[in-house]
Amino acid sequence: MALPRRPPTLTRVYLDGPFGIGKTSILNAMPDHTPDGAPILKVYEPMKYWRCQSTDLVVAANETPERRRGGALSRFQSDMIMASIQARFADPYLLFHERLSSKCRGKIEICDTPAIILMLDRHPVAAILCFPITRYLLGEYSLEMLISSIIRLPLESPGCNLTVTILPDEKEHVNRICSRDRPGETADRNMLRTLNAVYASLVDTVKYANLTCPYEKESWEMEWLGLPWFEESLLEEFISRPRPVICSRTRMPLDRTLLAIFKRKELCSENGELLTQYSWILWGLLTKLHTINVELFDISGMSRRECASAIMHTMPERLSTLASWNDLCELEDDVISYNKGMCNEVGASR
């Protein structure tokens, strides 16, 4: 009697982090196949969608706060425009995430020989969480709009690998942004510092969620009460504080996570407890992040090929997802269609 054929596996890796440090270049340097011949599919940043519709979203996102500061827009008008822009940034990620999630059947811990490797330029968490939080901390996005954005974060299917790339050398980061000279893009050092801090805190948040959800809600609520109010005086500390690496088996202190910035009197009762609806939202955020396998990848001093090689070297250690052969064939078509319709990369199917 023949043994049942083992279902194929899919390894998916999201490459994320602050803009301008070379994620797309790393993606382009990835090989088209593994040494065993498995295809490596690449999903690029949806720059065509962002820039080639009726509004250039990159330009609008940077111009709108300037218009408010110049008096051309009220705070309310600016908030509404920024919320709309940020939602449109997120739309392509959410669209592809929904299609991809339907093909992920279950998690296995390690797979040396996946049938397909999928490399994606950013996870939905970038447009829904990291950039809105950065804008909020810079005073360019309201707290209520930030809360509204967080609700949109989708549930994550098993087997998600998130690699957050960082480039601590601020001068090098600025040089890279200036050298690519994209219209409407600015190398604002304050924004870069804030964005880097947010991404570093995202890693801590995911690690906290890994060990807290779904069974430690009461413990989380007790830790929450011990957090200080996130007043303006804590903003600089959040941005500049050192974040030493903590063992993944040790629960991260809550004050190192992104949740700490939500300890605001607008969201809490007098004793510091979250109001019910905001408790649902923030606990929901943790539960959506808790299945993600996250790592911090410092690319300092590395060429794009060295970065790609390092990612490939650790591929056997990443989580994989069971799929079906029909799903994987459809996924390859989805990647080709998405890149063609949404992205500027020519012929970027693999």
UniProtKB/Swiss-Prot annotation:
Keyword terms, alphabetized: ATP-binding, DNA synthesis, Early protein, Kinase, Nucleotide-binding, Transferase
Function of the molecule: Catalyzes the transfer of the gamma-phospho group of ATP to thymidine to generate dTMP in the salvage pathway of pyrimidine synthesis. The dTMP serves as a substrate for DNA polymerase during viral DNA replication. Allows the virus to be reactivated and to grow in non-proliferative cells lacking a high concentration of phosphorylated nucleic acid precursors.
UniProt GO molecular function: ATP binding; thymidine kinase activity
EC class name: transferase
List of catalytic residues: 45
Organism of this sequence: Meleagrid herpesvirus 1 (MeHV-1)
Reactions it catalyzes: thymidine + ATP = dTMP + ADP + H(+)
Cytoplasm among keywords: no
Enzyme Commission no: 2.7.1.21
Tree of life domain: Viruses
Family the entry assigns: Belongs to the herpesviridae thymidine kinase family.
Self-association and partners: Homodimer.
Database matches in Gene3D superfamilies: P-loop containing nucleotide triphosphate hydrolases
Binding positions for substrate per the UniProt entry: 86, 182
Name of the molecule in the record: Thymidine kinase
Gene Ontology biological process terms, A to Z: DNA biosynthetic process; TMP biosynthetic process
Residues that coordinate or bind ATP: 17-24, 176
